[in-house]
Swiss-Prot record:
<dbReference type="GO" id="GO:0050570">
    <property type="term" value="F:4-hydroxythreonine-4-phosphate dehydrogenase activity"/>
</dbReference>
<feature type="binding site">
    <location>
        <position position="217"/>
    </location>
    <ligand>
        <name>a divalent metal cation</name>
    </ligand>
</feature>
<keyword id="KW-0520">NAD</keyword>
<feature type="binding site">
    <location>
        <position position="172"/>
    </location>
    <ligand>
        <name>a divalent metal cation</name>
    </ligand>
</feature>
<keyword id="KW-0862">Zinc</keyword>
<comment type="function">
    <text>Catalyzes the NAD(P)-dependent oxidation of 4-(phosphooxy)-L-threonine (HTP) into 2-amino-3-oxo-4-(phosphooxy)butyric acid which spontaneously decarboxylates to form 3-amino-2-oxopropyl phosphate (AHAP).</text>
</comment>
<dbReference type="InterPro" id="IPR005255">
    <property type="entry name" value="PdxA_fam"/>
</dbReference>
<comment type="similarity">
    <text>Belongs to the PdxA family.</text>
</comment>
<keyword id="KW-0460">Magnesium</keyword>
<feature type="binding site">
    <location>
        <position position="143"/>
    </location>
    <ligand>
        <name>substrate</name>
    </ligand>
</feature>
<keyword id="KW-0170">Cobalt</keyword>
<dbReference type="GO" id="GO:0046872">
    <property type="term" value="F:metal ion binding"/>
</dbReference>
<feature type="binding site">
    <location>
        <position position="282"/>
    </location>
    <ligand>
        <name>substrate</name>
    </ligand>
</feature>
<dbReference type="GO" id="GO:0051287">
    <property type="term" value="F:NAD binding"/>
</dbReference>
<comment type="subunit">
    <text>Homodimer.</text>
</comment>
<feature type="binding site">
    <location>
        <position position="142"/>
    </location>
    <ligand>
        <name>substrate</name>
    </ligand>
</feature>
<keyword id="KW-0963">Cytoplasm</keyword>
């Protein structure tokens, strides 16, 4: 018996960036069409212009609901139109208040559709935080906005590729603020949410989690900082007592040399701050990495790159990350 394909809400991202183009490219791939039923949430003019830029034979059809899009053929891109921007409003490479407000509406509606069960998951194209801020929507990024929309306090941002998966204890924080945010409770929460979120990607076995130190050489017995002894090691010990397969803390300067070996020794890595974990992740998975928000009551994946304003309108932006985010969203949806 054939398993029904999950319907995935795909938010268009910033109309002035590469989002519309990478969505067109992704939905032109038969492998993506075989994995899911797509529903794009966005703007008709922006998507139509992307079809032209990409020289795509796909047809854009406006629908009023996910149900209306469910049985459309693969030659069609179903669009739930949530903004009506004029061509003059879509200025490639230039974020604006109008585009920022439109982006917010796409994300909000996709989250609502996921929460009501009208779609199985959502995959998001890149946004401009500057544009959203201009429009009065003051969020550090997708992750924090979705956590608020889902009324979720325990969420984790994880970036992932085929070899590395890296979850963050702190996300968009100034480096000077990070040490004060490293607590036993925060590290333990991140370990728990990561283990639970990664399990479906590991055949639902207990995932192997590695935890990084904050300081050089794991603090060198307190010479370079006490966060390891005060917070990180107690969190690891508590997680182990709960039956989780957790190891560490590991010194970040050498850890990733071994972590990228295949087969990977760990299913996920918990890093203390943004650049500690994401520099090595992006060195290994710059093109194919994705973002997964763990801990939400919904499934949300995203590309692991920005709006690429310098490429907008050229039709040359890589859709590899967009394809991967849709594919993983569909895979996770199949486990629920």
């Amino acid at each position: 018996m054939n398993t029904p394909k999950p319907q995935i809400a795909i938010t268009m991202g910033d109309p002035c960036g590469v989002g519309p183009e990478i969505i067109v490219a992704a939905l032109s791939d038969p492998a993506i069409r075989s994995a899911c039923k797509p529903l794009v949430l966005g703007d008709r003019r922006a998507m139509q212009r992307a079809l032209t830029v990409c020289n795509s034979p796909l047809e854009l059809i406006t629908v009023s609901s996910p149900a209306e899009a469910a049985d459309l053929p693969d030659s069609v891109i179903p669009l739930l139109e949530l903004s009506s921007l004029a061509n003059t409003d879509i200025d490639y490479g230039k974020p604006s208040e109008l585009s920022g407000d439109a982006v917010y509406r796409y994300i909000r509606r996709a989250a609502e559709l996921c929460l009501t069960g009208e779609v199985a998951a959502m995959a998001t194209a890149p946004i401009s935080k500057e544009a959203m801020h201009r429009a009065g929507h003051h969020y550090p990024g997708h992750t924090e906005l979705l956590a608020e929309l889902c009324r979720c306090d325990e969420f984790v941002m994880m970036l992932a590729g085929d070899v590395l998966r890296v979850a963050l204890v702190t996300i968009h924080e100034a480096l000077a603020h990070v040490p004060a945010l490293i607590s036993t409770e925060q590290v333990l929460k991140t370990i728990r949410v990561t283990a639970n979120g990664v399990a479906p990607l590991c055949g639902n076995r207990s995932p192997r989690i590695a935890v990084l130190a904050l300081n050089p050489h794991c603090g060198e017995g307190g010479m370079f900082g006490s966060e390891e002894a005060d917070a990180i090691i107690p969190a690891i010990t508590a997680a182990q007592s709960e039956g989780l397969d957790v190891a560490g803390p590991f010194s970040a300067d050498t850890f990733f040399h071994f972590a990228v070996q295949e087969p990977a020794p760990y299913d996920a890595v918990v890093a203390m701050y943004h650049d500690q974990g994401l520099i090595p992740l992006k060195m290994r998975h710059f093109d194919d990495g994705i973002n997964i928000t763990l801990g939400l009551p919904i499934i949300r994946t995203s590309v692991d790159h920005g709006t690429a304003y310098n490429l907008a309108g050229t039709g040359t932006a890589s859709a590899t990350s967009m394809k991967a985010s849709i594919r993983i969203a569909a895979k996770l949806a199949a486990t629920r």
